[in-house]
């Protein structure tokens, strides 16, 4: 709570995962005592885990991870639930180009989409893993008209960079 209050003058986008998200009691304490927006959800895995967050108005934004929630279909269900509570969604990214593009594709048809949470300064680092570079212009990602997510993993690159003991 002290940290969130100290950040209030800086108009941050959100205070991410301020407490373990399964502790709705602690999250409520933070929510009631700070003025910064709160974002939670990267560690929740199903739409049912988002219910208490949404019903109790414990977050200004939610950030489900498309990989950890089970894919695009579950992510879209979570987004629809959040829309009913007027809560914007910002898919979490910590897994690479497939995760970024899956989240971006899902959000292309979600009215309460805020942004795809990622480390935009490092997105081009993903290009070595894939057959087509991510189309990043400014602060936006543009989706391909190629089938699926619009990319394929560069299997030759992946094979050449296998870490001993981890497959290959």
Show which residues each predicted segment covers.
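Adenosine-nucleotide cofactor-binding segment
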Residues: 1
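C-terminal extensions of enzymes
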Residues: 130-168
């Amino acid at each position: 709570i002290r940290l969130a209050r100290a950040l209030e003058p800086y108009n941050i986008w959100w205070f991410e995962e301020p407490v373990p998200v399964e502790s709705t009691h602690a999250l409520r304490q933070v929510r009631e005592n700070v003025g910064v927006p709160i974002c939670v959800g990267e560690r929740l895995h199903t739409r049912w885990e988002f219910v208490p967050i949404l019903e109790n108005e414990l977050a200004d934004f939610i950030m489900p991870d498309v990989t950890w929630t089970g894919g695009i279909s579950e992510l879209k269900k979570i987004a629809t639930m959040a829309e009913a509570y007027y809560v914007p969604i910002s898919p979490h990214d910590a897994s690479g180009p497939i995760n970024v593009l899956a989240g971006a594709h899902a959000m292309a048809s979600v009215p309460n989409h805020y942004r795809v949470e990622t480390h935009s300064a490092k997105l081009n680092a993903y290009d070595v893993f894939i057959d087509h570079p991510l189309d990043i212009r400014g602060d936006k990602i543009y989706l391909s008209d190629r089938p699926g997510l619009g990319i394929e993993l560069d299997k030759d690159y992946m094979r050449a960079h296998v870490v001993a003991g981890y497959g290959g």
